[in-house]
Amino acid sequence: MGCIEHKSQPAESAKTDEHSFNSKGEMQPRAPETPSKEFKNGKVVKVNDVTPKGVYRPDYKILTPNMRSPEYVQMSTAAAITLGVTNGKMYRCDCTRCLNLLLTYPEGCRANCAYCGLARHREAERDYADRNFIRVDWPSVPTEKIIDIVAKDGDQTPFHRMCISMITHPRSDADTLTVLKMWTDKISPETVPVSILSNPTTKTTGDVRQLKELGADIFTVALDAATPELFDRTRGKGVQSPHSWKKYWQILESARDIYGKNKFGAHIIVGMGETEFEVLNLVQQLVDMGGHSHMFCFFPEKGSLMDHLPATPKSQWRRVQLARYLIDYCDVRVEHMKFDSEGRVVDYGMGASELSNIIDDGTAFRTSGCPGKVRDDISACDRPYGDSPVSDISSYPFKLNKKDIKKARKQLNIPVVQNT
């Protein structure tokens, strides 16, 4: 989708203010505490050993059942509503187009990422199946039940994509393969394409290849942090977590070689202390590799080591959203752009009129992720309100209306271009 003429956007129409970004100095996670032995590795759930009965909705007033993959998986609240296994409504959304599945075990995720509600340090506070993740609860559902519902719907399924999300657990690699095979045995990848959100820490190149052979369409890696330093601070040794930047990139490069152009990507969280220049250089690097970036706006997750920190300012988020869209889909390069002394975008490397048209289209401000069945630049993984409240939406899970676009333009501080 080449769509632009590379002319400079006048700097005065992309003004920034001095407090419009989250700086590295302020975005410091708390130090993790070590849970006492009686709470480690899901001990409470395993000792009680409550037999699961169908769908389990997080409930802190009852004993959490002993559920584990591949027999059980968790799913986002939006997916559970769309599938019909739980009741609820979503603001301005009839459904979600991506069936997000999350592997689950009483031991939980053994990583300790600072921004994540599933992190290991929460063992004493909350059983794994009851923890919030990207702002919502994740009901646990028998895997066969999910597959049977989607298979029965056939071509009429509301889902344009399914994604298996791994966690850091000794069984996660093998169980991802099992869940994928259970799915593709009954549902054609042509009906519902499959993505893998991987855990590179335990992955090998052989694992990456085997997932493709079993029917996975897109392979993604959650880098999340935009620089090696921030990665180590939030996902590695800085928070007593096992992940490494080097291993994540090794698996990402394997995915490039095995899946091919436009069939791999990386998640990036904006606003954890990186500059806009740094994150957009990463976006450019991914595009040059043949992949895509899937952007998230930092929002302090309750119970995480960063829940005391500010959400990404909307001005910073909108600038990065817009610039990322231009790099990913409009043939603009980061070298065409200009940045101020704080690394903020002040020139998008595009003529004012063309840029204004892209803003007015609104697609740049929608949730980014793996594509569905509409357009390559419209994500099936719409994650309703996963990074903001409905009162001030960061990633729009639906087509923006004129009022939404007006608000996004105001947050960008880019005026409407008057046609002469």
Q: Across the structure, where does each feature detected by a protein language model lie?
A:
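Auxiliary Fe-S-binding modules of radical SAM enzymes
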Residues: 1-97, 280-420
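N-terminal pre-triad scaffold of radical SAM enzymes
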Residues: 72-122, 161-164
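Short glycine-centered, acidic/aromatic-flanked micro-motifs in structured strand/loop junctions
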Residues: 103, 166, 198, 268-270
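Core AdoMet radical
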Residues: 121-145, 149-175, 190-207, 211-249, ...
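Generic structural signal for well-ordered alpha-helices
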Residues: 147-150, 177-184, 208-209, 249-253, ...
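Conserved glycine-rich "GG(E/T)P / GGGxP" loop and the immediately following alpha-helix
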Residues: 160-186, 271-278
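Short beta-strand/loop segments at the ligand-binding rim of alpha/beta enzyme cores
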Residues: 188-198, 259-268
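Conserved C-terminal portion of the radical SAM core fold
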Residues: 218, 223, 227, 245-305, ...
